Regions:
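Glycine-rich FAD pyrophosphate-binding loop
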Residues: 2-37
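Conserved N-terminal helical subregion
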Residues: 2, 42-183, 226-239
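Acidic/histidine metal-binding catalytic segments
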Residues: 60-61, 246-261, 320-325, 338
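Histidine-centered metal-chelating micro-motifs
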Residues: 157-158, 177-179, 204-207, 288-289
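A short coil-to-beta-strand element that immediately follows conserved catalytic motifs
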Residues: 171-175, 191-195, 237-240, 248-266
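Short helix-loop capping/hinge motifs at secondary-structure junctions, enriched
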Residues: 184-191, 214, 227-228, 274, ...
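Active-site substrate-recognition segment that forms the wall
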Residues: 194-229, 246
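Conserved mid-domain beta->alpha element of the FAD-binding
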Residues: 9-10, 26-27, 151-152, 208, ...
Length: 352
């Protein structure tokens, strides 16, 4: 998460600018809640949040699911379930949290302000490369800005990665996701329990879990596409197009009369990078690698990045280049493992 980078590196007296695709027009802007935006925080992510002293607020704003329940998409027939509340806490020492993304952003933004970190949004920052300079500079609002360290967190479509890390190529987009949040009011009983539900289908699957916000349930539908998928950040589609794409069970389809806006997202993948560092620039989060989201590790991966980066800088405070190279080596190894498991999960979830 961009905001976690700000907080952690600020504590190490870092000088940092974060090029970002996010825009905060108003703290009270609730537009984000119209989209499916649930996230899952596992033990590693919660560890970082504890170090930021915000874990308590995150836990209070989310829920700790009791079970992982498996279903056949056809007829919503139960396959089995696994207790995860106590199992995960016993194994990893921390609980598994499901919550709304906007709530986590709000908590981190409040922490940034409390620590008096200066942050500026609505500013496009692009890389400025010159052959005779050892470091990359920032071009922003017509000005050249020099910084010791630039942390790039501008997402799967990272402009910085395209310019500076040209060797990292995108994989062909073959899958897409539909996301939205529904009130549990008119949903079947299987969605009303405090569980993560995983529904298997042929070449597709969907996941649901509570977000802790006014009884809202997060729905994420993923499927393999037969044809070309537009390489856009998101695309607004009609409810009928979504229903036609998924051919949902009639029981579930009848639960969607209140759905007015559905967004279709291309699942953008990139090749495993050899390095996520060049000169004074490092990639974090989805900017480092776009991968199949079949481990629900997007937020955790970004939180891990911020923690590892800060610790590497702390270890080598007088040798930034060495610190960044160590960060890159550690994170690339981790990304390789996450990508491998995510691709395996795709085969399992899609019954292949």
């Amino acid at each position: 998460m961009i905001l976690s980078d700000l907080i952690i590196i600020n504590r190490n007296d870092g000088k940092i600018i974060l090029p970002s695709k996010f825009t905060f027009k108003d703290e009270k802007d609730k537009a984000i809640k119209k989209e499916g935006a649930g996230i899952q925080i596992t033990s590693n992510g919660l560890f970082v949040l504890e170090k930021l002293h915000v874990a308590g607020a995150v836990i209070r704003g989310g829920l700790k699911p009791d079970n992982l329940c498996l279903f056949d998409e056809d007829g919503l027939k139960s396959i089995g379930s696994l207790e995860i509340l106590n199992r995960l806490k016993y194994r990893y020492g921390r609980s598994f949290i499901a919550l709304h993304r906007s709530h986590l952003i709000k908590i981190l933004l409040e922490k940034v302000k409390a620590e008096k970190i200066k942050i500026s949004f609505d500013s496009e920052a692009l890389p400025l490369l010159t052959q005779d300079e050892h470091c990359v500079s920032i071009f922003c609002k017509g000005e050249k800005i020099k910084k010791d360290l630039i942390v790039v967190a501008d997402g799967v479509g990272s402009k910085w990665k395209k310019i500076i890390f040209k060797e990292i190529k995108k994989r062909s987009i073959s899958q897409s996701a539909y996301r939205f949040v529904l009130s549990k009011k008119n949903l079947p009983p299987i969605f009303l329990k405090n569980n993560v539900n995983l529904f298997f289908g042929r070449g597709r699957h969907f996941v649901t879990y509570p977000t802790g916000v006014n009884g809202a349930i997060n729905f994420v539908f993923c499927k393999r596409e037969k044809g070309h998928v537009a390489n856009d950040w998101k695309d607004k589609v009609s409810k009928q197009q979504f229903l036609d794409d998924f051919e949902l069970d009639e029981t579930l389809e009848a639960c969607f009369p209140s759905v007015k806006t559905i967004y279709k997202w291309p699942i953008i993948e990139s090749g495993i990078p050899f390095s996520v560092q060049k000169k004074n620039v490092v990639l974090v989060g989805d900017a480092a690698i776009g991968m199949l989201p079949y481990m629900a590790q997007g937020a955790n991966k970004a939180l891990e990045d911020s923690w590892v980066l800060a610790n590497c800088i702390k270890e080598y405070p007088l040798d930034l280049e060495k610190a960044l190279k160590k960060y890159s080596k550690k994170r690339v190894k981790r990304l390789q493992k996450l990508d491998q498991v995510s691709r395996l999960n795709e085969k399992i979830y899609h019954l292949e």
